């Protein structure tokens, strides 16, 4: 990792921590982080999860050793902040643009999902539609999401 990356990554992690601190001090019911990057949560999954969800059907084995990525420090900080916050946390991103709403963040100690964390990956090119976020502070999860199809962009199959 070069100096530019290290500086940018430190700024990203500091910004995220400040955001969680502000949300905690202000009594926020939830927090939503919106970014372009897909931080590749799958790279941090326990081997049993990789086998079950990603590789088993292909007859492949998960890697014996995991390679470090540029997102490792960010994801570790995201885990710590999410657990400490204890309320709904949503990470919205594009990048790979495969529409999904899931629970991809696992505890590094428990190796189980962190229940108050949700990822929303927006749909994108060539399938140009959008995702509606519904915010209701009275609901326990605060956020819900719905894919909205743009009729003019619908494909004739």
Feature locations, PLM:
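Binuclear metal-dependent phosphoesterase catalytic core
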Residues: 97-157
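His/acidic metal-ligating clusters that form di-metal
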Residues: 1-104
């Amino acid at each position: 990792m070069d100096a530019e990356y290290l500086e940018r990554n430190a700024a990203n992690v500091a910004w995220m921590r400040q955001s969680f601190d502000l949300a905690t001090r202000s009594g926020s019911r939830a927090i939503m982080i919106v970014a372009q990057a897909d931080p590749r949560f799958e790279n941090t999954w326990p081997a049993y999860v990789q086998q079950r969800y990603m590789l088993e059907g292909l007859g492949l084995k998960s890697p014996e050793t995991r390679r470090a990525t540029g997102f490792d420090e960010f994801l570790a900080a995201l885990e710590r902040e999410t657990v400490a916050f204890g309320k709904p946390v949503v990470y919205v991103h594009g990048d790979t643009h495969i529409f999904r709403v899931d629970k991809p963040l696992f505890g590094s100690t428990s190796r189980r999902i962190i229940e108050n964390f949700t990822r929303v990956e927006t749909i994108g090119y060539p399938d140009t539609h959008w995702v509606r976020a519904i915010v209701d502070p009275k609901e326990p999860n605060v956020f819900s999401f719905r894919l909205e199809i743009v009729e003019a962009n619908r494909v004739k199959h």
